[in-house]
Curated annotation (Swiss-Prot):
A divalent metal cation 3 binds at residues 174, 178, 219. Zn(2+) binds at residues 98, 101, 116, 119. SUPFAM superfamilies: Nudix (SSF55811). A divalent metal cation 2 binds at residue 174. It comes from Salmonella paratyphi B (strain ATCC BAA-1250 / SPB7). This is NAD-capped RNA hydrolase NudC. Divalent metal cations. Mg(2+) or Mn(2+).
Amino acid sequence: MDRIIEKLESGWWIVSHEQKLWLPYGELPHGLAANFDLVGQRALRIGEWQGEPVWLVLQHRRHDMGSVRQVIDQDAGLFQLAGRGVQLAEFYRSHKFCGYCGHPMHPSKTEWAMLCSHCRERYYPQIAPCIIVAIRREDSILLAQHVRHRNGVHTVLAGFVEVGETLEQAVAREVMEESGIKVKNLRYVTSQPWPFPQSLMTAFMAEYDSGEIVIDPKELLEANWYRYDDLPLLPPPGTVARRLIEDTVAMCRAEYD
């Protein structure tokens, strides 16, 4: 339940609007509410970090509004809370009216949900599951440059899970669609909330089975096998893609060094 922020309230402040985050001095605001002109604003407590509350404030600031990507290199827990705040802010902004009857809605006091008093419909934040997979062939890993990454970054393959599809089926389909190869020995590794805008990345490792690389030009600029000790520009630390690549490199080193 939200509350009015008082002068001596302190903590971490997620000030968000339209999927943007207020980052004065390039950092998440931390400290007394009075120091950030937040006294009197409505805020929702969305978690705790290092023993202090994390507050969500639905507000636009004229300056220093940026992407949550700018805090990705901070601690994973803090990045996750920042992502939660941005996703919740967008959820509340986009669910002011009921999609069934058109009447105004209001936030639930007990959970992350919006309620319609007219038809009693209940809405929850939508989460889009995605798969991301590192594919190994002997001492090499399959890396691709995506159409949306024209800065030279090469990463592992990923894609959204379709309706009525298992995670395993999504891996096989996405890999085939984007690269033209088949994989085997799929193994789940980890997951990562990814607020761009509302994804949950489910990470896997797999082994090459068969086929030659044939890229989908609508998705990829190029794809190739890279030996573990001769890699191109990689995604930044803190991303699950980087974790998968580093784990694959570690396995290759153990076998081939």
